[in-house]
């Protein structure tokens, strides 16, 4: 029996992704897919995802103080602002009505399919238990889970004394692109990949100090697994975002996306 929640359901996602792919002519979809795959590869090769810190985390070599430093800065840079960016991407999908890539007869509907797909991600973020809706709660949202984790670590998210300038710069960078649908998709895809790469490593190192640290936030991040009781689904969300970027990708903006 498939125990995936409906935000992980292949049937639901297949319907959405089928519409998205077929909203473009086959040749354009193929061309855009190649361009987006090149972007994905360049991101996968980025120094962030080859950082020696990953190995140290997997080997549980970081001290609790170092982990506190990471979490405080991660909160400012990404966690606090993630649903802002995701919600704005859902809104900015209105621009698909005028997207020249999309068949004219499908442009209005395209924004709904995009919003539905992105909303699967948002529902997970907001704390909906999509297997058992009665267990849903804003207290189980990823942001509130992270705030709880900070509290367990005796960290005050409002105290920026130990927050690095780079964390603020990243938050400002995301805000700078908040009105661009395509830019937000690329930023969100990168963020999902970062979550996939680092969540398991951080969870491993955190578990050395207290198993309690691995509950809540870290229990709902990672990849979707058949038969798992967890709601982790970041790999599907990342793939969905790449599909949406393929739909609206413009070859004229190739340099812009590469620089972004």
Please annotate each region the language model reported.
Residues 2-260:
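Non-heme di-metal
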